Every structure is written in C-alpha cells, then in structure tokens.
C-alpha cells in the first residue's frame, strides 16, 4: 500500500509539478578597459544574460588594431562561447559573437553552465560596459509531502 501511495505522489510530481518562479540570483556591471580580458568561465543558476550598454568600438576598426590582425582567427573584442560538438565526445565547438557598437542596448540570454570568455579590445581608450546576471529557480514555495503522507 505504501509503495502505491509513493508511486501516486511521484506521478503527481511528474505530471503536475509545483510551479517554480524564475528570479534574478545575481546581478553585476562589468567595466572592461583596453587590453583587459575575461577568461573562460561559466555561471551559477539556470540562465545567464549580458546586456551590452556601451561598446566603444566598431569591429572593423578593432580587427585592424588587433595585434592578431594577420592571424587566421582574429577574435579581438569578441565574446566567445564553447560547447561540445554533436558527437558529445571530444570535439569542442566555438561560437564567436562580434559584439561591437552595433550591439549597444541589446543582450543575450544563454544557459548558465555554457563556458564563455571575452577577448580584449585595442582600438579605444573608453570602457566597454555590460550588465550581467544569472536567473535561478526559486523553490522556496515547494513542499515535500514525504512517503508517510
């Protein structure tokens, strides 16, 4: 009898889960200067976001000013994401976002555990300013009935 009651509660949790509110878990502002970079990292929570408030360069000028201007992959000023390829075994895929002045007042939302980094910029003495944060589920209203209920 107890097993069937537990199975019934499990069925209710799967098909009628408690609602979870999505909340901002953390919020911060980044001020990045010329030559600075943000190394590869990920975040806490479920989703993260970046809002590009001020980007002090145009990508065309940035790529020309970069010390890697003759490199095969010049990523000056880019935001880059890293993830496993389709076979999920060893191939790492990369997506580079050329976030320049045209991205101002725009944003990105991505899974928090997605590794990413920000490359340095070289063509401006102004700050790159972004607002970033993490969304997390608020489960404070969840209750557990337990196997004895």
Q: What feature does the model see in each segment?
A:
Residues 114-117:
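Short, charged beta-turn/beta-strand-edge "cap" motif at the junction between a beta-strand
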Residues 16, 125-126:
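Short helix-terminating capping/connector loops at secondary-structure junctions
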Residues 25-109, 119, 126-129, 141, ...:
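Catalytic core of non-heme Fe(II) oxygenases with the double-stranded beta-helix
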């Amino acid at each position: 009898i107890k097993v069937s009651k537990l199975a019934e509660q499990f069925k209710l949790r799967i098909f009628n889960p408690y609602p979870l509110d999505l909340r901002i878990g953390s919020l911060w502002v980044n001020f990045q200067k010329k030559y600075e970079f943000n190394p590869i990292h990920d975040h806490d929570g479920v989703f993260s976001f970046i809002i590009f408030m001020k980007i002090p360069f145009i990508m065309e000028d940035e790529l020309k000013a970069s010390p890697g201007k003759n490199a095969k992959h010049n990523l000056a000023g880019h935001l880059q994401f890293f993830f496993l390829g389709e076979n999920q075994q060893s191939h790492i895929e990369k997506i580079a976002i050329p976030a320049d002045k045209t991205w101002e007042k725009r944003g990105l939302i991505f899974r928090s555990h997605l590794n990413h980094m920000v490359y340095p910029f070289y063509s401006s003495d102004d700050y790159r300013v972004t607002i970033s944060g993490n969304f997390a589920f608020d489960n404070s209203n969840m209750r557990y009935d337990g196997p004895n209920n």
